[in-house]
């Protein structure tokens, strides 16, 4: 179906190839799993197989790629190739350009000249598959990260291509949504589709996979069956693609002060008729490490955007360090609260990695040798020491995620809020990220993070807040946490996949989109 022969690729003026001497044949009807560390070359491989490197990006290309025995260079650009190969990338936002979800899904079908009746049938089926029918008239950029991924997936499924490539396409989905994707992919495979899943967390799909490709530094390190891959722990743990942390479910609560750093009283947030937050009462104390869990659209991101004033209460009251957010300028609040967005690209706008970090430091008056020291320390903490002069958009998704964290921790806010901080990170990097959070906590910072990852919660977090439909339904110490709700728990996926469409609450986590917020604002710059 797709064959790569002695294929190597180097981006632009880069000195090191992103892919080196790749030899791989993807068979018709196969479900291939591709995994590896951040920056291993996974996304580049997806771009190569879809013909995007040849027809859109350019760069130094060696060897060849063929689709159905025809060199991809011979196709009439992406327009022709996309009739056969559908791709969903890790950054769903980059694929969403229309004003409503329905238009987003219709657009590809219209471009292919399908009759209206056929377009209606396909789009309805795709939206039902992805449980987003209730979002059909919503603006994609106003949806939560997980909802955006579902829309991008539905738009691609509607095209009914022979090949489907998913590049970290479930990274921001809750466990119910991942189970639904599992069910859909199984049906597509049974129908003879060729599917390529590129992900750090392939364990969710090993049951239906045919082969596993392990990438390391742009090269294929191993190709194995799923059973061989899981039976030999060296393939997983030696490359640190599974978590190696010991469970720490009896972590103590770290309340070191009587006065909360965050106080939320009777907080309600409405957007027209949509109730996004429903009468929330909550206190977070200095020195705590808190996780906020919940399904896509449960209100998690809406809640934490109140912690630095990006959102103002519809009713109720939020205070940060005693400052009421409804009356205190955001520029003042961000001195106390650092927020790392779910999508790191919404925070990155400078020409180099070091300039990204320096931007926030300059805004809070840190300059000269002190700024240099802060930059070097934050880069070392997130393991990006060798990337100071790199253009941020040339980093992998995982590296961009770590850079966004570095930009915030360099400013040393008392409260650090991270929205899905391990998205795009493999297990080793996720563990390292959480060890960093523990270190920052020990230095006196308060840490609040939104996550779907139950393993991370079990290993590192002291207190768990669970949300449903805009309400806090559980607030407990880790050791007492019920484990209910939408979290990524491995046992959820093995052999017990529901065939029913999972309904989702209409509440959007990002009704006020990250894109509508000035990037400079969260790092002490001008707030629009």
Swiss-Prot record:
EC number per UniProt: 7.-.-.-
Superkingdom of this protein's organism: Archaea
Residues where ATP 2 binds: 294-301
One Pfam family in the UniProt entry: ABC_tran
CDD domains: ABC_cobalt_CbiO_domain1
A GO molecular-function annotation: ATPase-coupled transmembrane transporter activity
Primary location: membrane
Record bears the keyword Secreted: no
Span of domain ABC transporter: 2-242, 262-494
GO CC aspect terms: ATP-binding cassette (ABC) transporter complex
Keywords: ATP-binding, Cell membrane, Membrane, Nucleotide-binding, Repeat, Translocase, Transport
PANTHER family from the UniProt entry: ABC TRANSPORTER ATP-BINDING PROTEIN MA_1418-RELATED, HEAVY METAL TRANSPORTER
Assigned protein family: Belongs to the ABC transporter superfamily.
NCBIfam families with a match to the protein in the record: PRK13648.1
Full protein name: Putative ABC transporter ATP-binding protein MA_1418
